[in-house]
Amino acid sequence: MSAPLLQTHALTLRAAERVLVDGLDLVVAPGECWCLAGPNGAGKTTLLGTLAGLRPVDDTPPRHAPLTASGRVTIGGKALAQWRPASLAKVRALMPQQTRDAFGASALEVVLAGRHPYLAQGRWGAWESDDDVAAAMTALAQVGLEGFAARDVTTLSGGERQRVSLAAVLAQATPLLLLDEPVSHLDLHHQIDALERLGRHAESDDAAVIFSCHDLNLARRFATHALLLDGRGGWRAGPVRDILSAEHCSHAFGYPLRLIRDGDDEALVPARRT
């Protein structure tokens, strides 16, 4: 059995006095594709940022900090604090929920930013090699944007821009991908294409994926596992069909859901108001 790629022990996240996640014990092994689900404000973005190492995990966090994390997070068996940023960037990649383009750049230039851990350092700074450009073009092709390399990202639609962000994460070529709502702006067939691509990444050697998603049925179809937050500190983790059940999701989202079946297909649907 492979060693966990990512692991948390007693991870607790707080926003001021509110507990977002209480005592999370999570093990993510190579080959697994995890969906992170839960209502708005449950802490999904905060959790992904914490797993990525964007905030310190401290057993004695500052009392008045707006967001705090305590417990333990390890990637590849090493605590986050022990990773050098340059080395960590070759192991995990994070796709944020929103991207704001302060100035124009081509899609290829944006995707090349995902290659920053590998850029050759020269006297005048870091420069892309032919291999970096090839990796970026391959990533654009993987999201169906090979013809958009020269397009200014400020001229793209929301869905096209989101696919460029996904390409940048793929170009970073890390075993662990953390993605915050990576398909929220995509139409259905691009959602399916993107989730199939993430699933193939998880199936590769020593790789895993964690993505947040509000579409529970897409998550049930493409994820192998799920982490469900209830917005009150509670959580459930395990195989996706066990966790994203009508009972558990009804409790987490505060609205009754029911599971319908059509042969081998299943779907969660909202129950009618009575």
Regions found by a protein language model. Give the residues of each.
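The feature captures the beta-strand-to-loop junction immediately N-terminal to the Walker
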Residues: 37-39
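Helix-to-loop junction immediately C-terminal to a conserved catalytic motif
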Residues: 52
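ABC ATPase NBD Q-loop/coupling interface
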Residues: 64-87
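Conserved ABC ATPase "signature" region
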Residues: 112, 127-148
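Conserved ABC ATPase signature
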Residues: 152-156, 160
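Catalytic Walker B motif of ABC-type/P-loop ATPase nucleotide-binding domains
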Residues: 177-181
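ABC ATPase nucleotide-binding domains
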Residues: 246, 250-274
